[in-house]
């Protein structure tokens, strides 16, 4: 049952705003519009002021659901004395990293290179020419425990600028040159070697007791999990394949049972602060939901739909995504970790919306029964609810979750049912009833801030996740929702054929454009092209293929550098270095996804230019793929497709025919590596433009062709023959 999201609070511009950020649409910038700091948005007005007054720039980058961004705002940006230092001696600029990933990634590269670590809020000091001087992340309000306080740092930078301003400008110009991406290319190792290296890395870092990889904090890094799915499929029934499936199953089940999974409100939190997947950082991101939806769905197919609990998680993520949906089909960006504990509180606390005291649950469930058992007793056992809370102090250093319980599942359904002498069916019914009661109670609490920005790249990831959920379950609700999101993109994020980066939720619930013209970035194009190809693969509509081809042409013109894809367009003079991402992290890189898109387009259209461009992507990333392939697991999967070759099914004729319908269903049931599907209804279809596909279009209908490399099997024209065809996999 779909539970409604708690009431959405949208930050809007009012006449009380103190600075220029009140004119913006970004929820993050609006959060800072009442600071006493004279904030500017990223743009020429701020840059010119810095040049005219010969002042350094203080650049602060974050996002609206960032916990430590909130902390630094409260401690420093709302402090009048600190604001005076900033206003007198600097030009202060605020950037929403989700609006401007190009700005974020450029200066984050500097911060990581100079300090050894990165994160948000990011705090960077720049010359008026936008060259970096120094930087870091969170700065405390006072000198403390060996850390310099933010006011001290401001005064130090101001003093040094007065004395050594010209020297700092020269040094900044040199730093910018060092940040220029390398353009070298070379030969790439065989994909088998690359795969073996990544697999060995995951195997050696696997936590066999708790699931996941490495030590705390643990992130649900979908890129790595997706690699293991592909690796397992490529290894057939080998011991490595079985080992990969074991690692996947342990990790995915541990995540689903742990507190990182919101058992009452659905979806997954950002990461686990400890190794047990129990206490999370409570923020929820659309890109996590979307990628994990795809991961659980692909795992469900890989394991031949054997695990009902995996299907339950697929639906659970979908339920959460429905809660963060715009009525016209888009998905909002993120939900905050922090909220007010109650309506009389003035200070937000992390996890307040999600955690429970035992007595509160007991009062809500009252004397309800499951069979002869107390519903409360069953729920307390099922979700590890303890009298003094189940949160270890080591996971809660600030005491925000004292006496609270973060729900997690430590027992199997069978164990819990046995403990209370009820059947598993009774248990499930009772737990569902309790979840509904607890959710209704949660919606009465102050809700966390919702970042209502709708980002193109994340809409693309959402579509891919939904399409894969449909393939794994064949439940049409997922496909319907994916197509609705595609319609939303066409209506609101498509600007005369090109893409916008994002749109916003207006005060009246309608979609609004931003005040600044922020064009889409390469990840917006790459992720959306992937989504369109996923839709085309599944439903066969020529319109999805045509749009994917059009966007690929635009992406190549705007972002191609000969060896991959820049983050930003060359027309943006405000960003002095065009970066190329070289690590698949919380999200994959644009080049990783684009390389696979190009190979899929080659399979469908038979144009060698796509395959050659993918090859150039691999050559451009050769050093990373050859030395640290774990950094690019998504590109490694594309490399495998390029070197091993695709398996292409060509479906010719009426898509509603019994033969083609059955073929699509069978394709949904199996996880097939490097799969491409071509749909041809007539010789006029774009997909029939290649030489071999044109010949197939002129042949018998309906028919199914299976091709690998440059060899195609004889056409299958009867359902009885499909069994033999699919037995080859």
UniProtKB/Swiss-Prot annotation:
Signal peptide: none annotated. GO terms for biological process: carbohydrate metabolic process. Pfam families: Thioredox_DsbH. InterPro entries: 6-hairpin_glycosidase_sf, Ssp411, Ssp411-like_TRX, Thioredoxin-like_sf. This is Uncharacterized protein B0495.5. It comes from Caenorhabditis elegans.
């Amino acid at each position: 049952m779909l539970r409604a999201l708690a009431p959405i609070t949208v930050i809007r511009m009012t006449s009380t705003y103190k600075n220029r950020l009140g004119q913006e649409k970004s929820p993050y910038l609006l959060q800072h519009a009442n600071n006493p700091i004279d904030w500017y948005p990223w743009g020429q007005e701020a840059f010119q002021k810095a040049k005219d007054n010969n002042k350094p720039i203080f650049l602060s980058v974050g996002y609206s659901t960032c916990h430590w961004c909130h902390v630094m705002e409260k401690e420093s940006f709302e402090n009048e004395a600190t604001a005076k230092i900033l206003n007198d001696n600097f030009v202060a600029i605020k950037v929403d990293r989700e609006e401007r990933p190009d700005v974020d990634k450029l200066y984050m590269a500097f911060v990581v290179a100079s300090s050894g670590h990165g994160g948000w809020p990011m705090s960077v000091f720049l010359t008026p020419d936008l060259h970096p001087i120094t930087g870091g992340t969170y700065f405390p309000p006072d000198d403390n425990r060996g850390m310099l306080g933010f006011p001290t740092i401001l005064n130090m930078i101001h003093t040094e600028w007065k004395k050594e301003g010209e020297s700092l400008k020269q040094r900044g110009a040199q730093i910018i040159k060092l940040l220029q991406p390398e353009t070298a290319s070379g030969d790439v190792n065989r994909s088998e070697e690359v795969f073996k290296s990544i697999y060995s890395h995951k195997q050696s870092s696997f936590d066999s007791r708790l699931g996941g990889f490495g030590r705390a904090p643990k992130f649900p890094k979908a890129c790595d999990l997706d690699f293991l799915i592909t690796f397992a499929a490529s290894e057939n029934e080998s011991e490595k394949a079985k080992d990969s499936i074991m690692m996947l199953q342990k990790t995915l089940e541990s995540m689903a049972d742990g507190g990182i999974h919101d058992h009452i409100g659905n979806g997954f939190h950002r990461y686990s602060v400890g190794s047990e997947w129990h206490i999370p950082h409570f923020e929820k991101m659309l890109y996590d939901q979307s990628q994990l939806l795809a991961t659980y769905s692909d795992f469900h197919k890989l394991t031949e739909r054997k695990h009902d609990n995996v299907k339950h998680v697929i639906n659970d993520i979908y339920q959460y995504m429905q809660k963060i949906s715009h009525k016209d089909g888009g998905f909002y960006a993120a939900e905050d970790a922090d909220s007010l504990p109650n309506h009389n509180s003035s200070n937000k606390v992390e996890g307040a919306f999600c955690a429970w005291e035992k007595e509160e649950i007991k009062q809500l469930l009252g004397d309800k029964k499951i069979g002869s058992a107390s519903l409360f007793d069953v729920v307390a056992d099922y979700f590890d609810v303890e009298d003094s809370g189940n949160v270890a102090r080591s996971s809660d250093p600030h005491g925000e979750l004292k006496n609270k319980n973060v729900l997690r599942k430590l027992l199997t359904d069978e164990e819990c049912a046995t403990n209370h002498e009820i059947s598993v069916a009774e248990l499930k019914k009772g737990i569902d009833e309790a979840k509904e009661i607890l959710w209704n109670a949660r919606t009465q609490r102050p809700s966390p801030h919702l970042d209502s920005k709708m980002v193109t790249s994340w809409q693309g990831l959402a579509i891919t996740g939904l399409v894969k959920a449909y393939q794994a379950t064949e439940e049409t609700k997922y496909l319907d929702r994916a197509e609705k999101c595609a319609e939303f993109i066409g209506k609101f994020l498509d600007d005369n054929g090109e893409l916008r980066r994002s749109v916003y939720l207006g005060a009246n619930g309608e979609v609004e454009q931003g005040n600044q013209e922020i064009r889409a970035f390469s990840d917006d194009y790459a992720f959306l092209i992937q989504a369109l190809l996923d839709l085309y693969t599944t439903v066969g509509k020529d319109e999805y293929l045509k749009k994917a081809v059009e966007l690929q042409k635009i992406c190549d013109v705007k972002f191609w550098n000969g060896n991959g894809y820049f983050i930003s367009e060359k027309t943006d003079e405000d960003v002095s270095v065009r970066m190329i991402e070289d690590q698949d992290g919380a999200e994959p890189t644009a080049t990783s996804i684009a390389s696979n898109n190009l190979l899929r387009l080659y399979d469908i259209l038979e144009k060698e230019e796509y395959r050659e461009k993918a090859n150039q992507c691999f050559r451009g990333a050769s050093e990373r793929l050859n030395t640290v392939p774990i950094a690019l697991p998504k590109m490694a999967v594309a490399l495998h497709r390029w070197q091993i070759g695709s398996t292409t099914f060509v479906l010719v004729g009426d898509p509603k025919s019994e033969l083609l319908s059955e073929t699509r269903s069978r394709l949904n049931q199996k996880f097939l590596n490097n799969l491409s599907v071509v749909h041809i209804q007539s010789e006029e279809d774009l997909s029939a433009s290649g030489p071999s596909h044109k010949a197939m279009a002129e042949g018998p209908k309906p028919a199914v062709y299976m091709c690998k490399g440059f060899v195609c099997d004889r056409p299958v024209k009867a359902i009885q023959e499909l069994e033999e065809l699919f037995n080859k996999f």
